[in-house]
Swiss-Prot record:
GO CC annotations, alphabetized: plasma membrane
Gene Ontology MF term list: membrane insertase activity
Main location group: membrane
Example GO BP: protein transport
Family membership: Belongs to the OXA1/ALB3/YidC family. Type 1 subfamily.
Role summary: Required for the insertion and/or proper folding and/or complex formation of integral membrane proteins into the membrane. Involved in integration of membrane proteins that insert both dependently and independently of the Sec translocase complex, as well as at least some lipoproteins. Aids folding of multispanning membrane proteins.
Sequence intervals crossing the membrane: 3-23, 346-366, 369-389, 436-456, 509-529
UniProt keyword annotations, A-Z: Cell inner membrane, Cell membrane, Chaperone, Membrane, Protein transport, Transmembrane, Transmembrane helix, Transport
Pfam families for the chain: 60KD_IMP, YidC_periplas
Localization per record: Cell inner membrane
Protein name, per record: Membrane protein insertase YidC
Oligomer and partners: Interacts with the Sec translocase complex via SecD. Specifically interacts with transmembrane segments of nascent integral membrane proteins during membrane integration.
Keyword Nucleus belongs to the record: no
Amino acid sequence: MDIKRIILYVIVALLAIALFNAWQRDYPPTPKPTPTVEQPTANGDHPTAYTPPAFTPGAAEKTKKAGTIALTSKVPEARLITVRTDVLDVEIDTQGGNIVSAKLPKYPVSLEEKQTPVQILSGEPNELYVAQSGLTNGNGQPTTVQFESAKKQYVLENGQNQLIVQLTGRAPDGLLVTKTYTFHRDDYAIHLAYQVKNNTSKPWQGSLYTQITRRQPPTEHHHFYVRSYNGASMGSPQTPYEKLSYESLDKQNIDRTSQSGWIAMQQHYFLSAWVPGNPELTYHYYSHVIPASGEPNVYVVGFVSPQMNVAAGSEAATHATLYVGPEIAKRLKGLAPGLERTIDYGWLWPISMLLFWILSSVHAVVKNWGWSIIITTILIKIVFYWFSAKSFRSMARMREMQPRIQALKERHGDDRQALSRATMELYRKEKINPLGGCLPMLIQVPVFIAFYYVIIESVQLRQAPFIFWIHDLSVKDPYYILPIIMGLSMLAQQWLSPTSPDPTQQKMMWILPVIFTVFFINFPAGLVLYWITNNVVQTLQQWYVNKTYESHKAKLKARRARKRKR
């Protein structure tokens, strides 16, 4: 194998390792919490699972100290309302009307547990993750309302496209509050509407707040290639996507205003996000951390709407949208600008989005994500064929120069400067770029990395089958057949390459496929499938270039001769 090809493979491997190291640096593993014994409160009862923390808009430091969150008991069943649609199973706590549980029946936890849906929101103390919303008074303090509903169970029946859950209650200051959740068929976006009727004799001032409260989850023990971002994020017209890691929230609270925007909590494949109801208004975004002794901290991120002024005898309304579901670009893009960036495609996000569009377009025809990966890879190799052919021909010319370069080495002996000048003069005379074999191949490296992110982060490939024994393209091949095929494809590619006279390079020809087979053995099957297809197509392209190399060289020589005659 040509030494430049070896260098290219090593660069790709080093890039992968560098990405891993950067990821580890930015998102270090969370230490395991020390087990603690739950202590009852002073009156002998456990406090409720959570309460909306107090805050003062515009004063992040005050939010650190305001409010507490109870960590030792779950919401009583008597307070829960259940809502079931075709894509969501939700539980609402009538105290505050907050969503304390959200499951996704169309997304099983694993292929082995198909009856167990993925749960995003949970009121369980050890995995607290709830979507809260409510009203504040004129002092910025939240008011807790005990709501009532017409039913305890709501189901989106066949033939229905919309399900409305209406909660009513009276606030401590006498306001009549109606909180309405609207669910739609095949939709993970939940519309929230608040209506306030001021039946008192005094004017009322207040705001809508929405927030996500989450205990920092334990680090998932995956291999580095699936170490996806897990934490908070937000977007605004100025900054469409900004990660807010738990570590950064520990150091500094969010305290800023923005027109429209959104706030979210991310995990691999799924997220929850609050989106303001009116993109023309300016909202205050905030966060604070609630320390938990011996356990991971609890993090709160949210926003507050502009203040409403409701005269006595009048009413007002405000609204927002909660998204709880999979990270699907077309769904997220329609909710808020930049929300689709929560699909964490990394620093090559634009390329990844383009590749996913191509991949999904192919899938719309072939209906199989494995075949879609193969076809998309072939299309990529066709697009980059000119670069590959240029690289192959450049390497072939360099091999032709080896006897002449060897002669220069013998002539100049240990005089390295003279050898370097003579070598560069030879390259100039023969119109050879010594980097011509590497650069065209390096241009393709960003595409490989971008496609890597597409396969790792796209929820559409989660539990997607291919053929035969491959039932999930997002996890490793259970029988390691694909990594072995990949190693064999590398051997075939090297066998086609002219043998180098250098014994060291000859050894590398046989060692490198083994190294890459081991390196890829735990990679997702979809990524290995891409690499196999890439190798096979590249081998065929190299075979064709080698076959036509002499005729290409003759045509090039004739073209240069015609130019000299002119």
